[in-house]
Amino acid sequence: MSVSPIEAAVGLAIFGSIAAIAIPTFSSTVHASRLTEATEGLATIAANTVAQAAGKSPSEAFPTSVPLTPANVPRGHAEVDAPGIWDAPTWKAVDFRASPEGVPHWFSFELDSNASPNVSSFVTHAHADQDGDGLTSTFEIHGHDDATGATIEPGMYVEKEVE
């Protein structure tokens, strides 16, 4: 049984329609799963940073700042970390590492804390260059500690989320 040109054209049109729907959906799903790494990572860091502040004065509430880890943001692909990169005292204090040892990840993370006698604050950042063009996405969660206690501020700052 041979296929007529009209049947072939209809089959090709159906295949093209399915591909036109499936490919962008797949691409969006991949980007969303990568963004989960940043949002869940920052939520973990922020929650553990606030939990660590319980019962402490604002000047001692949060751990010291830790620089961007890894220092070079992964560019265009997920990377496996060097051994010991998450062993800094602050990362241990907030019980965080970007991924299990040997598992690649897309984002670099940082925790900046500022201590003062009455009000202390922190900002935790995540940065990635998912498309490898040299521009980075930025995700941030802010928190503070004062006389009322430590809290995570509502919302998340996001800039260039799919870079």
Task: List each model region and its residues.
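N-terminal single-pass transmembrane signal-anchor helix
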Residues: 1-30
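Short, glycine/small-hydrophobic-rich surface segments
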Residues: 36-44, 49-98
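Low-complexity, S/T/G/P-rich flexible repeat/linker segments used as non-globular hinges
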Residues: 136-163
